[in-house]
Amino acid sequence: MGLLSQYMCERAQGTRHAIVIDPADQSPDVAANRALAAANAGSRMILVGGSSDTDMTNVHATIVSIKEALELVTWASTQDSDSDENPSQIPVVLFPQGAAALSPDADGITFMMLMNSKDPRFLIGEQVRGAPFVKKSGIEPVPMGYLICEPGGKAGEVGKADLIGYDDHER
C-alpha cells in the first residue's frame, strides 16, 4: 500500500472532505488560493481535474501552484527551512478527465473507471493510455469506480453515461 492509500485509510475513522478544483475554471494562482481556503476550512485532499477539456500544461501548472502554496504555508508555520516535516501534508491528487491531463508532480491519481459509461474509452481506454505515464512518473494510482446519477451534468455528457435515475432501484 502506497503512502497516499495509507493516508486515505488512516483517515477512514474521521470526517473527511476533498475538494475538486478544475484547472479550466481559473488560473493556477487562483486555484492555489482556493486550495488554501479549502485546506483552512478542513479539506484533507485536493483533487485536480474534471470533465473539461484541459491540457497537460494547465493541469501541471495548477498542481505545481497548489503544492507550492501548501509548502509555503507549512514552511511559514514552522519557520524552519531545515525541517524534516512533509511540506505538503494535504495530498494533491489528479482527478483527470483522461490521459491527456496528467502531471508528474501530483501525489497520486484517481485511476477511475466510469462504470456506467456507454463508451469503452471511459471504461478502460483512458486508463490504458495513461498507465505508462503513471508508471514512469511514479505517482501513486488509487483505484476508483465512478457512477453518475441523474441529472448527470457535464460529466455525464462527456463520459457518455447511462445515467442512474432517481427511482432506479434495480440496477
List each model region and its residues:
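Alpha-helix-loop-beta-strand connector modules within alpha/beta enzyme cores
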Residues: 57-98, 130-142
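Conserved anion-binding
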Residues: 97-171
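Glycine-rich, proline-tolerant flexible connector loops at the mouths of alpha/beta enzymes
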Residues: 45-63
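N-terminal amphipathic alpha-helix/helix-capping segment at the start of soluble metabolic enzymes
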Residues: 1-21, 127-143
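Hydrophobic faces of well-ordered beta-strands that scaffold small-molecule active sites
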Residues: 16-21, 46-48, 92-94, 109-111, ...
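Short, acidic/polar
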Residues: 26-37, 97, 166-170
